[in-house]
């Protein structure tokens, strides 16, 4: 995750801003600079290579002292920065909202996946600039629309019905922030269309998740899609979701956290996110992840939780 201000800077033209991508030499200069504390939140002028991000975002970049940041000296960084600028330049951003726009925290891996989709001749985003723009605006939080199947970050499709598409996510070969853990496995479920869904199609998804992905928890980050993650990674997701939610509240970003369908979401996660929306502390919310919940009535007839061991999936073991 990183703020949009890590990729580009605003240049005032008439009454609105044009956004320009950073080059990696300017960022490199900023990372070596000694900056007064009062100037940490200001864009840095590298003198030689142009404008660089505010020094307060130093930890967002991979350096000898910080391996957890993004690899900004890659071609992919430039491609992602240009993708963001193209999207922002399609909007009218004024002095009143430029700060809020640039403080928006976005998913670096999601944006890299959009670049990968854009460069794939078999993908619809390769052929449609309008759809690519729409997908990018959603990814950077500048659209009220949710991420649906056609505007999704992409991946390998492992399940699809009339209402949902399930993607296997892999970041092993990413350039900006690869996940090199060979055991990493995660999925995302997007809605094919943002409209009411038939119980029949919900039941099909629930059955698929229950029998094929029983080692995973179904959660949401509040953005209109489901994530299927290992139970061992749930606490980490909770920390990230809570931090992003609080950051958005603090900066005044419109943050309509979508709890999604309670019949699909893991019961403990639904309790966690509901508590978070009520304004409780992280500790109070996270306790709900580890509490034994009272089993809910099965909303779907004929979908039993009783299953023989040889019928239970080994995915994620």
UniProtKB/Swiss-Prot annotation:
Residues annotated to bind ATP: 107-109, 188, 221-223, 227
One Pfam family it belongs to: Rota_NS35_N
Metal-binding among keywords: yes
Active site per the UniProt annotation: 225 (for ntpase and rtpase activities)
Cofactor(s) this protein requires: Mg(2+)
GO biological process: viral genome replication
Documented effect of changing residue 153 to A: Almost complete loss of NTPase activity. Unable to induce NSP5 phosphorylation
Impact upon substituting residue 225 to A: Almost complete loss of NTPase activity. Unable to induce NSP5 phosphorylation
Intracellular or extracellular location(s): Host cytoplasm
E.C. code: 3.6.4.-
Keywords: ATP-binding, Host cytoplasm, Host-virus interaction, Hydrolase, Magnesium, Metal-binding, Nucleotide-binding, RNA-binding
Molecular function per GO: ATP binding; metal ion binding; nucleoside diphosphate kinase activity; ribonucleoside triphosphate phosphatase activity; RNA binding
Region (RNA-binding): 205-241
Listed GO CC annotations: host cell cytoplasm
Coiled coil: none
Lineage top rank: taxon: Viruses
Subunit structure: Homooctamer. Interacts with VP1; this interaction is weak. Interacts with NSP5; this interaction leads to up-regulation of NSP5 phosphorylation and formation of viral factories. Interacts with host DCP1A, DCP1B, DDX6, EDC4 and EIF2S1/eIF2-alpha; these interactions are probably part of the sequestration of some host SGs and PBs proteins in viral factories.
Protein role: Participates in replication and packaging of the viral genome. Plays a crucial role, together with NSP5, in the formation of virus factories (viroplasms), which are large inclusions in the host cytoplasm where replication intermediates are assembled and viral RNA replication takes place. Displays ssRNA binding, NTPase, RNA triphosphatase (RTPase) and ATP-independent helix-unwinding activities. The unwinding activity may prepare and organize plus-strand RNAs for packaging and replication by removing interfering secondary structures.
UniProt record similarity statement: Belongs to the rotavirus NSP2 family.
UniProt name for this protein: Non-structural protein 2
Organism of origin: Rotavirus A (isolate RVA/Monkey/South Africa/SA11-H96/1958/G3P5B[2])
